[in-house]
A protein has these predicted regions:
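Polar/charged side chains located within well-ordered beta-strands of beta-rich proteins
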Residues: 24, 44, 104-107
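Helix-loop element at the rim of GNAT/NAT acetyltransferase active sites that forms part
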Residues: 22-36
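Conserved N-terminal entry element of GNAT/NAT acetyltransferase domains
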Residues: 1-14
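Conserved acetyl-CoA-binding loop-helix of GNAT-fold acetyltransferases
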Residues: 97-110
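Acetyl-CoA-dependent GNAT
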Residues: 37, 42-93
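Conserved GNAT acetyl-CoA-binding A-motif
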Residues: 113-115
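Amphipathic alpha-helical recognition patches that constitute DNA-binding helices
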Residues: 19, 85, 89, 102
Length: 115
């Protein structure tokens, strides 16, 4: 059984580029994106560099027992207005499992208590 204690977060870094683009371009995730085109490597790398330098965004790799199972992001962070936007990518192997629900719980916790 998967529990919240088995889920950890770490900040995304440039070395996560290949993993993130693979998840982002997978059909099950891509078709749910506002911008549903297949992202090319150069476009993705430029985007990732800008994300990593954006103080109004936080991106995390979500691990389940040391295995990367998805990414979670909180963007458009306004400390003044206490608002933000969030989303996640879940590795296909974990879709339909409790991992997505736990990611939602963690995201809400971070937005309410850490921003």
């Amino acid at each position: 059984m998967i529990s919240l204690n088995d889920i950890t977060l770490r900040n995304v870094n440039i070395n996560d580029s290949d993993r993130l683009i693979k998840w982002r371009n997978s059909e099950c995730i891509r078709k749910k994106m506002i911008n549903a085109h297949i992202v090319q490597k150069e476009e993705h790398e430029n985007w990732l560099r800008s994300v990593l330098n954006n103080s109004n965004a936080q991106w995390f790799i979500v691990n389940y027992k040391e295995t990367a199972v998805g990414a979670m992001y909180i963007t458009d962070i306004s400390k003044k207005d206490k608002t933000s936007t969030w989303g996640m990518y879940v590795d296909r192997r974990y879709m339909g499992s409790v991992v997505g629900v736990l990611m939602e719980v963690i995201a809400i916790d971070k937005m309410v208590f850490d921003l």
